[in-house]
Curated annotation (Swiss-Prot):
Entry-linked NCBIfam families: inosine/xanthosine triphosphatase
Native source species: Korarchaeum cryptofilum (strain OPF8)
Top-level taxon: Archaea
Catalysed reactions, as listed in the record: XTP + H2O = XDP + phosphate + H(+); ITP + H2O = IDP + phosphate + H(+)
Name of the molecule in the record: Probable inosine/xanthosine triphosphatase
Single biological process term from Gene Ontology: nucleotide metabolic process
EC number: 3.6.1.73
Function comment: Phosphatase that hydrolyzes non-canonical purine nucleotides such as XTP and ITP to their respective diphosphate derivatives. Probably excludes non-canonical purines from DNA/RNA precursor pool, thus preventing their incorporation into DNA/RNA and avoiding chromosomal lesions.
HAMAP family: Non_canon_purine_NTPase_YjjX (MF_00648)
GO molecular function, one term: ITPase activity
Cofactor note: Binds 1 divalent metal cation per subunit; can use either Mg(2+) or Mn(2+).
Amino acid sequence: MIVAVGSTNPVKVEAVRRAFSLFWEADVRGVDVESGVPKEPFGPNAIEGARNRARNALRALNADFGVGIEGGIFHLFGKYYCAGFVWIERKDGVHSTGMSGWFECPEAFLPDMLRGRELGDLMARLSGNENIKREEGAIGFFTRGAVKRVDLYTHGTLMALAKFIAAGRWPR
């Protein structure tokens, strides 16, 4: 089975590899595709970006599954949260979605993010690590490595895989 990930970010590719390998033998490949949304998407834009990445990756590699992971900012109950939205689409058009765990977005970052700055850029400045979004991520920095970005995205991918894992047990 070929699984196309709509990103070459090693964190996203590894998260998908970890999730799929729990259930199937999968050849997981990252491919550079367009998300069609702003670099730091808010709310529905993150969902749209994940969908676009999954579909574009599926087509680009003629894969069995396409996976799009889009980190974004979500506003609920008066606060902003960072999370990863995951869209998985099978080659027959059936899709499923999931999300990673959420964590509160630092309020100090919000003015810059609302103007289009990416969380990864702000974290690079704060941490001194220019590659933080391709490594531990903001959550890894803030939890001192207890939870890493790959963990969040593996969790989100598993949530999106539930429909496919359940197969005949998924209610119609």
